Amino acid sequence: MRVLTIFLLFMTSIFAVQIKDVANTVGVRDNQLIGYGLVVGLNGSGDGTSSKFTLQSISNLLQGMNIKVDPNDIKSKNTAAVMVTAKLPAFAKSGDKLDITVSSMGDAKSLQGGTLLLTALRGIDGEIYAIAQGSISTGGLTPRPGGAGSHSTAATVMGGANVEREIPQNFSQNNDLTLSLKVADFKTANDIERVLNTVFGEEVAKAIDSRTVKLKKPEDLSNVDFMARVLEQDIAYKPQSKVIIDERTGTVIAGVDVEVEPVLITHKDITIKIDPNNNAVANQNEIDMKDGGFVDSSSNTLRINNAKSTVANIARMLNKLGATPNDIIAIMENLKRAGAINADLEII
């Protein structure tokens, strides 16, 4: 069973990045939206009669069209109740398009090929900020045993919603400008302060703590002009190593140099051994998988040469062995829990 695995290779050495890549402007942020809707047109893969809220929703929808139907008389399996979520970006204007995520609430088997009906998306204040509607595509992958493939009960619809209401902003009149680092780090905060004060020739930045840098706009610049110049300045930066696994697609994203320390773990019927002796020769009963990996079919053990033990190599070898996304996630979590992965592990 093959798993789609993608490796984005990057080095963790120090290099120059723009301030906008490592810090956010406080107050300039996305806002979460949520709504409840119905997906219709499913080929028998929708909610069953046990999902009472779906039947009631269908009845309510038809009643709004002057068609009265008792929820108990509805037997359609071509409809699914869903939650729809979206992010409303800062400064979004009426008519802008938003990407939406549609997720099944009931016992639907798949949303593939369905159509999301008109759904109001509300903010935390209960107001409607966007309207969603459109065709659903789950990526064309069918669900497989063990979690391989995409989740056909959830989908992202690009441009599936229109912004109807704008969030009031007073950025141009705001005199309290602050940067918030995406990853707290005293050195980065100090570097931002030093670079900005040097560029502007006056004290325009003050590092308050490991995450916060207060800004003071020069009188001859507008807020927009000032922040544009601030955010484009380069600083020296060393990114924190990270491994990201997309549970839905099985995609693994890792740096080429994210190493795994010597360890021995067992997951289900697979044993993984990172060989501290750097033995690059196949032992008896072992098959050379290349890239420093050897499989002992008699004990179902994957032995990896320590010099080649990176997250990328381990994921690639597990993929060759037919491991499912769920297996890879569990193995990576166990490696992290054992202290063998020197990077942050994020499951999305």
UniProtKB/Swiss-Prot annotation:
Pfam entry (one): FlgI
GO annotation, cellular component aspect: bacterial-type flagellum basal body, distal rod, P ring; outer membrane-bounded periplasmic space
First and last residue of the signal peptide: 1-16
GO molecular function, one term: structural molecule activity
UniProt keywords, alphabetically: Bacterial flagellum, Periplasm, Signal
Database matches in InterPro entries: Flag_FlgI
Compartmental location: Periplasm; Bacterial flagellum basal body
Location (main, coarse): periplasm
Gene Ontology BP, a term: bacterial-type flagellum-dependent cell motility
Function of the molecule: Assembles around the rod to form the L-ring and probably protects the motor/basal body from shearing forces during rotation.
Quaternary data: The basal body constitutes a major portion of the flagellar organelle and consists of four rings (L,P,S, and M) mounted on a central rod.
Matches recorded under PANTHER family: FLAGELLAR P-RING PERIPLASMIC PROTEIN FLGI, FLAGELLAR P-RING PROTEIN
Entry's family note: Belongs to the FlgI family.
Name of the protein: Flagellar P-ring protein
